[in-house]
């Protein structure tokens, strides 16, 4: 049983009620009040057979765990995400060797070795995120890591390209698990005013692009954080101790497992269809995600062809993008939670968009600098400065966008919201880089990157729109999950 760190304030009644209001604004009353005959929910605090937390200071509640326990879980989940994305980006230099070994002459097939892995990021969350909200986060972490390790070994022993590509997409699906449910874990562990730094650490993995060692750490150190699953276990213990078989956890639905699974699987799709907030934020972050992958895959050819870099020194081209992201991450971590705490009155999820409003629009500026200075072969440091601006600006789109979804939909639906985000975002990462060659051949580096910059500019009003009208839209476009 967890112990409460005295340095951490337990959530009081006002925080819990604020969380309930936040849920009502986004997913209607489905998670708070009795519903129709399709799924009656048991949520009567006066019912002696309803098992709930033992007040706001219950040490079993993940919000009351010690700071060490919370941070350990955060680090493990972040390492999962980092390793999953590094497996995509680190393989790119080896694609040519794979093409030689399997006698692949089609460049598109070679590119698919990376793209199919990233496509798995979109497919996996459709099942994994809903399952985590029904059966808990921990079992998904265990299962995904096992499948990932097995099929990564399978990739190493593949005897033909078809086998390799199938194994790669399965690896991508397994790797997507921590990415889609990690936001839910963060929401389980940290109250809204502390999620900025936590989500920044978790989210940086996909921007930098499960392994066996991390899997061992998961088994040893990680515990379940899903509130519903924890209450189910608490009710199960109480039934065993008291002999009262009528005890049920709070917010239990009278549904069959098949009904629960079907409802959970359609959650991400319902969020995309019925919530303009989820759709537009996912499109915006998806374009930036795909843009990063496009730059990753084209840097070597651009700097070798234009500036005569050797294959060894071409790696320096990544410094601008990487340093921009790291600096942006540090600045965001320092400012995000501090700005939220300084707000007068109750903080809104939309307050996470302040930095996105002002700093996100510099991303197109970086693309213009990079494209036109590379086109005219201006000193190589100038286009790298442009990529620094791209990395810095994109950080203030992707991370605030995902934190906004987590804050807006709460722990109960955060995993589904992140799954919806991945469903839109990952295809951009998988396929946008395939357009780089025809784009640059047709338009050149200047206009080619300018087109990408103009597309980014089209989405710059999104955070302004949601900052002003987001709360009203969350109330108007309720999604019954």
Swiss-Prot record:
UniProt xrefs under SUPFAM superfamilies: MFS general substrate transporter
Bias (Low complexity): 1-13
Topology of this chain in the membrane: Multi-pass membrane protein
Superkingdom, taxonomy of origin: Eukaryota
Gene3D superfamilies attached to this UniProt entry: MFS general substrate transporter like domains
Localization per record: Cell membrane
Protein keywords: Cell membrane, Glycoprotein, Membrane, Transmembrane, Transmembrane helix
InterPro entries xref list: MFS (IPR011701), MFS_dom (IPR020846), MFS_trans_sf (IPR036259)
Primary site of residence: membrane
UniProt xrefs under PROSITE patterns: MFS
GO annotations of cellular component type: plasma membrane
Cysteine disulfide partners in this protein: none
Transmembrane annotation, as ranges: 72-92, 111-131, 146-166, 169-189, 201-221, 276-296, 315-335, 353-373, 380-400, 403-423, 439-459
Stretches the record annotates as Disordered: 1-58
Glycosylation, residue list: 64, 106
GO molecular function: transmembrane transporter activity
Function in brief: Efflux pump that might be required for efficient secretion of equisetin or other secondary metabolies produced by the equisetin gene cluster.
UniProt family annotation: Belongs to the major facilitator superfamily.
PANTHER family reported for this sequence: MAJOR FACILITATOR SUPERFAMILY, MULTIDRUG TRANSPORTER, PUTATIVE (AFU_ORTHOLOGUE AFUA_3G01120)-RELATED
UniProt protein name: MFS transporter eqxG
Organism of origin: Fusarium heterosporum
């Amino acid at each position: 049983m967890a112990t409460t760190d005295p340095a951490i304030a337990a959530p009081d009644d006002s925080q819990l009620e604020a969380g309930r209001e936040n849920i009502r604004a986004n997913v209607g009353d489905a998670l708070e009040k009795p519903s129709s005959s399709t799924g009656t929910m048991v949520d009567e605090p006066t019912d002696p057979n309803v098992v709930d937390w033992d007040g706001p200071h219950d040490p079993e509640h993940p919000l009351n765990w010690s700071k060490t326990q919370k941070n350990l879980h955060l680090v493990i989940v972040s390492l999962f995400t980092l390793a999953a994305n590094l497996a995509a980006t680190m393989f790119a230099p080896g694609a040519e060797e794979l093409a030689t070994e399997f006698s692949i002459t089609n460049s598109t097939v070679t590119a698919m070795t990376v793209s199919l892995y990233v496509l798995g990021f979109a497919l996996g969350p459709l099942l994994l995120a809903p399952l985590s909200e029904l059966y808990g986060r921990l079992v998904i972490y265990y299962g995904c890591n096992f499948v990932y390790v097995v099929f990564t070994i399978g990739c190493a022993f593949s005897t033909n390209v078809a086998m390799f590509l199938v194994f790669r997409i399965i690896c991508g699906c397994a790797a997507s698990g921590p990415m889609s449910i990690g936001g839910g874990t963060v929401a389980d562990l940290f109250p809204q005013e502390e999620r900025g730094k936590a989500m920044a650490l978790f989210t940086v993995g996909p921007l930098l692009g499960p392994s066996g060692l991390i899997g061992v750490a998961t088994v040893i150190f990680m515990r379940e954080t899903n509130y519903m699953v924890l209450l189910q276990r608490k009710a199960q213990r109480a039934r065993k101790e008291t002999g009262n078989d009528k005890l049920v956890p709070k917010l239990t639905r009278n549904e069959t497992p098949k009904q629960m699974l079907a409802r959970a699987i359609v959650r991400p799709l319902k969020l995309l269809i019925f919530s303009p907030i989820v759709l537009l934020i996912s499109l915006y972050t998806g374009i930036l995600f795909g843009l990063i992958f496009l730059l990753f895959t084209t840097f070597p050819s651009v700097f070798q062809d234009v500036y005569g870099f050797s294959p060894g020194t071409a790696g320096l081209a990544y410094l601008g993008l990487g340093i921009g992201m790291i600096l942006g991450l540090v600045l965001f971590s320092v400012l995000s939670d501090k700005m939220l705490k300084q707000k007068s009155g109750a903080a809104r999820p939309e307050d996470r968009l302040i930095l996105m409003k002002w700093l996100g629009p510099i991303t197109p500026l970086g693309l213009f600098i990079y494209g036109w200075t590379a086109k005219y072969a201006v000193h190589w440091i100038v286009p790298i400065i442009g990529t620094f601006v791209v990395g810095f600006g994109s950080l203030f789109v992707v991370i605030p966008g995902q934190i906004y979804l987590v804050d807006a939909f709460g722990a109960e639906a955060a995993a589904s919201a992140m799954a919806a985000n991945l469903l839109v975002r990952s295809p951009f990462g998988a396929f946008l880089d395939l357009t780089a060659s025809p784009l640059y051949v047709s338009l050149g580096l200047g206009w080619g990157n300018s087109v990408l910059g103009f597309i980014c500019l089209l989405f710059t009003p999104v955070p302004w729109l949601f900052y002003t009208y987001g709360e009203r839209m969350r109330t108007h476009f309720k999604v019954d999950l």
